[in-house]
């Protein structure tokens, strides 16, 4: 494919021009990203505010309010009906913005906190109709991995705001809706979902992160017994990743940045908790 591409382009420009286009000069030190000085704080804030304006439904947009949308301004409406795990990653971006401005812009801080609360009240756009799977918090879902991402988002909201409600919801959702599912599998690993009990790395990676985070909170609160329980849960989930890991470190038959990344972070967290350098 590379040979064909080169041949095709060479008809439109010289070989040297093609080389210049495909192999730009590498700049070391203060990397030059633009022909002008970039204010990175301003750039980050600009991207964040544009993202929130376009993808967070601060008002009713085609029937959705207080949640994030697939499309800008929720132009497609009904397509947002099963938009759940994506909410967690969008929320992570909003939390990062909030962390940057909360000490310097009281008005903006209050606005974003209001968005957090709206999102929480809407249970992060959880579309799950089975009340048993939703659990008492309303954040549980058929998909275990989706629920884990929402739990992680709630932890991030708690860390940023100190609002105990977010922590309590995350912990209860894990204890009630996620961890009990390990009893449904012979291996003791978490299943992909209630309706498909096969464990996989896209579930057990973020699950290990969630459990390790709970262990951190428990240890910080002086509850070492609870910390050890959550460490054991994190290690159990991590074992699933180890089980499918090839000798070169790739996970599963199709390595993904998603699963490789969650495995790496889970291992780092467990190492910090246990001191076991094997992780």
Label each region the model flagged.
Residues 1-8:
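Bacterial N-terminal signal peptides
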Residues 15-138, 160, 164-188:
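Low-complexity, Ser/Thr/Pro/Gly-enriched N-terminal "stalk/linker" regions
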Residues 29-37, 88-106, 149-163, 206-224, ...:
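Well-ordered alpha-helical scaffold segments within catalytic/enzyme domains
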Residues 63-82, 128-157, 186-208, 247-268:
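Carbohydrate-binding/catalytic loop surfaces
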Residues 121, 178-179, 216, 239-243, ...:
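Amphipathic alpha-helical segments of tetratricopeptide repeats
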Residues 164-236:
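Aromatic- and glycine-enriched pocket-lining scaffold segments that form the walls
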Residues 230-232, 242-250, 254-259, 268-279:
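Extracellular glycoside hydrolase catalytic/binding regions
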């Amino acid at each position: 494919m590379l040979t064909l591409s080169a041949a095709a382009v060479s008809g439109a420009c010289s070989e040297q021009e093609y080389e210049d286009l495909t192999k730009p000069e590498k700049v070391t030190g203060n990397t030059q990203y633009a022909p002008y000085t970039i204010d990175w704080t301003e750039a980050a804030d600009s991207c964040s505010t544009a993202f929130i304006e376009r993808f967070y439904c601060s008002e009713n947009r085609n029937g959705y309010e207080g949640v994030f949308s697939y499309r800008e301004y929720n132009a497609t409406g009904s397509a947002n009906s099963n938009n759940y795990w994506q909410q967690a990653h969008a929320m992570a971006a909003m939390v990062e913005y909030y962390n940057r401005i909360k000490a310097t812009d009281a008005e903006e801080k209050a606005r974003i906190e209001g968005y957090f609360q709206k999102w929480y009240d809407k249970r992060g756009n959880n579309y799950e109709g089975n009340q048993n799977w939703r659990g008492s918090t309303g954040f549980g879902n058929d998909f275990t991995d989706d629920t884990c991402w929402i739990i992680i988002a709630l932890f991030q909201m708690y860390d940023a705001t100190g609002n105990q409600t977010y922590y309590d919801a995350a912990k209860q959702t894990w204890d009630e809706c996620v961890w009990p599912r390990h009893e449904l599998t012979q291996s003791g690993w978490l299943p992909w979902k209630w309706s498909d009990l096969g464990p996989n790395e896209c579930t057990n990676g973020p699950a290990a992160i969630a459990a390790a985070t709970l262990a951190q909170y428990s240890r910080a609160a002086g509850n070492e017994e609870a910390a050890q329980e959550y460490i054991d849960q994190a290690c159990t989930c991590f074992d699933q990743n180890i089980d499918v890991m090839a000798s070169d470190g790739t996970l599963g038959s199709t390595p993904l940045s998603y699963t490789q990344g969650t495995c790496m972070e889970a291992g780092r967290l467990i190492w910090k908790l246990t001191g076991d350098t094997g992780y």
